[in-house]
Amino acid sequence: CQSTDNRRLEKTLDLAQSNRGELEKVIQYYSQNEADSLKLKAARFLIMNMPGHYSFIGRNYENYCKASEKIIFSKTSMNKKVDKLNKLIRQYPAECFERVEDCSIITADYLIQNINIAFEDWQRGNWAKGITFNEFCEYLLPYKCTETQAFDNWRTVLRPIANDTLQDFEHNDLWNKTSYWA
């Protein structure tokens, strides 16, 4: 008899079709070392929850990303950036992008890197001390911030910015000592 989680995992692996091997590499990678058992559980969680999550691909999407990055990192006022981005969005409606299931295109290297960085942040960040494993899986572990986001190195880019900001939350467990927690 197969558990519900094993059936969900197998369903995702089947849905991945030719990309199945990439997802299996992630499971194999974390299966090699007993010390990675929690990372293996996290990897299985991510993979099981991939169905229904999509990314955009294709030349139109690549052109849109390049153009939006150019605007975002330009040295113009925020109002001008917003105006330019709104104009760009009208030039590239979502219908002109090819949408594919994440499980069919995500790479093992990308997932492994994201899992490892998420674990580092969870285990080393003072701000994350009170986060349970289930909360970690739901809120810190996901491999992208928004639906249809490109598989980029967002954690590496945002980490220095976020870590500086999150240092202010070193004492974030104070809320559970209040009457609201009772």
Question: Which residues are covered by each model-predicted region?
Answer:
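N-terminal accessory/pre-domain segments preceding catalytic cores
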Residues: C1-W181
